């Protein structure tokens, strides 16, 4: 019979095993406008997170985040801190979809901080985040915009790879977003799915059986932008809702699979951006 002391020792050994195998990574950099051209400023990378800058483009600088760990597992910690200076333009994506793997221990932690100065623009356009069954992750996204800054941001989450016959039944997904413009909080949201996620997604008021969800934020945004984004809405293959308030526009997406979600998000993002999306989105 296992004693309390032996249980504590087993728990401590398990914790040490998780700690030894946890990945960590951070990326911190800024971009600034120099003679009308956006250039990289200071850059700090550590652990398994890297950023690469493809050839410069006329409409600003492009960046690609790379997780050399190949995915995110329980207890991993990653942080991203990006600052866009006055009149600078940056579009950022990821090299591939981020995979959050099964965890029998602590949740992974993802912390993202984005700052944009006056007349600066940030396109935060990562590819999908895919959660495997029993994945556990907590994400924080904090955004600070100056009064004349602009933002195009999207995030999409896939609960299980349905095309591979996989479903996500249990796990933990906590997603905290905060957006401030000129120091004023204009958007705050925390999504908490914990436990039987598959059953929660089946609820009509949650996802009505959808397993692929996404959010796009556009700032500044108004009713005129909303009407433009709603054009050809009858062609959407997923459930899509678009609205505006507090000087920002938002689009919500919910689909039965990742392919439909991506197609609808790309249609909205192209119209919102007024330009082509990152090439990696097309591969």
Swiss-Prot record:
GO CC annotations on file: cytoplasm
Keywords: Chaperone, Cytoplasm, Nickel insertion
Domain of life: Bacteria
Principal cellular location given in the protein's record: cytoplasm
GO molecular function annotations of the record: nickel cation binding
Location in or out of the cell: Cytoplasm
InterPro entries with a match to the protein in the record: UreD
Pfam family, one: UreD
Quaternary structure and partners: UreD, UreF and UreG form a complex that acts as a GTP-hydrolysis-dependent molecular chaperone, activating the urease apoprotein by helping to assemble the nickel containing metallocenter of UreC. The UreE protein probably delivers the nickel.
Role summary: Required for maturation of urease via the functional incorporation of the urease nickel metallocenter.
PANTHER family: UREASE ACCESSORY PROTEIN D (PTHR33643:SF1)
Similarity-based family: Belongs to the UreD family.
Protein name per UniProt: Urease accessory protein UreD
Native source species: Rhodopseudomonas palustris (strain BisB5)
Taxonomic placement: Bacteria, Pseudomonadati, Pseudomonadota, Alphaproteobacteria, Hyphomicrobiales
């Amino acid at each position: 019979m296992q004693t309390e002391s032996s249980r504590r020792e087993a728990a401590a050994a398990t914790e040490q095993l998780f700690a030894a195998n946890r990945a960590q990574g951070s990326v911190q950099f800024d971009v600034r406008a120099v003679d009308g051209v956006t250039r990289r400023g200071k850059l700090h990378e550590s652990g398994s997170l890297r950023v690469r800058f493809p050839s410069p483009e006329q409409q600003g600088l492009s960046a690609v985040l790379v997780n050399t760990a190949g995915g995110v597992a329980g207890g991993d910690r990653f942080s991203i801190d990006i600052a866009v200076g006055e009149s600078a333009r940056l579009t950022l994506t990821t090299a591939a979809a981020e995979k959050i793997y099964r965890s029998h221990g602590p949740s992974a932690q993802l912390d993202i901080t984005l700052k944009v100065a006056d007349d600066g623009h940030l396109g935060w356009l990562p590819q999908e985040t895919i959660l495997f069954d029993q994945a556990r992750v907590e994400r924080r996204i904090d955004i600070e915009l100056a009064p004349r800054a602009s933002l195009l941001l999207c995030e999409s989450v896939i609960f299980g790879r349905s095309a591979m016959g996989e479903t996500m039944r249990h796990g933990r997904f906590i997603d905290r977003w905060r957006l401030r413009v000129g120091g004023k909080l204009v958007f705050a949201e925390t999504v908490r799915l914990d436990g039987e996620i598959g059953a929660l997604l089946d609820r009509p008021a949650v996802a009505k059986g959808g397993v692929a969800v996404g959010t796009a934020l556009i700032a500044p945004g108004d009713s005129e932008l909303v009407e433009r984004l709603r054009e050809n809405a009858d062609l959407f293959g997923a459930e899509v809702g678009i609205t505006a308030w507090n000087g920002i526009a938002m689009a919500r997406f919910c689909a039965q699979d990742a392919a439909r979600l991506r197609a609808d998000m790309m249609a909205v993002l192209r119209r919102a951006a007024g330009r082509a999306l990152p090439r990696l989105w097309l591969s």
